[in-house]
Amino acid sequence: ALETGTLKKLVLARQLQVELSDSIDSVALFYHACTLYPHAFVSLVSTPQSGTWLMATPETLLAKRPVGDQWYTMALAGTMDHSGPWAEKNCLEQRLVVDYIETCLQPHVVQLQRSMPYVRQAAQLYHRCTDFLFVLKPQVNLGNVIADLHPTPAVCGMPKALAQDFILREEHLHRAYYSGFTGPLNVWKTTHF
């Protein structure tokens, strides 16, 4: 599909199963992740239905600050393991995500502001990042905004519908919560996914 040009981008997952001889202290692991990744969104969720999931991501899908009407998202794409000049492939990949996010937001927002791309470090990796600030139009349903944005090209591909179909047909593993989103919804007037 990539060779024929049907898909501009495709992100496939792979699964690794490891058997551990000792039990894991998930809370200690959570605190360790918070220390290792101070600028990431780190969360630990454990329920009988879903199991235990430790998540750490430098990416913000959608966030609202506690004061005012301003929302935020980012286009985080293009990855290198060192700082330096960016390859054209990484610049193009990030530009695709910027265009995708702008297109998704247009029907839902006013006062859309976009930063210039900059380098954002996440642990030992460097990413190209563009920030978006905006105000939601009155009567906009937050669920519709999320449905338009997610999954982003960074975890699925482009065009979204074709990439999703390809993944469901060819990947042969259940992603469960992998590449999903989590976070507080209107907790102390803050939302952060």
Residue ranges of each PLM-predicted region?
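A short glycine-rich, hydrophobically flanked beta-strand micro-motif that places a catalytic Asp/Glu
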Residues: L10, F41-V45, A176-G183
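Short hydrophobic alpha-helical segments that form membrane-spanning helices or hydrophobic packing faces
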Residues: V11-Q15, Q106, V187
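An anion-binding catalytic pocket shared by soluble metabolic enzymes
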Residues: R14-L96, K189-F193
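A glycine-rich phosphate-binding loop feature that marks nucleotide/adenosyl-phosphate handling sites
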Residues: Q15-L16, T47-W53, E102, P117-L125, ...
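Contiguous alpha-helical scaffold segments within structured protein domains
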Residues: V18-E19, Y72-L168
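Glycine-rich, small/acidic residue-mixed loop/short-helix segments
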Residues: C156-L162, F166-F193
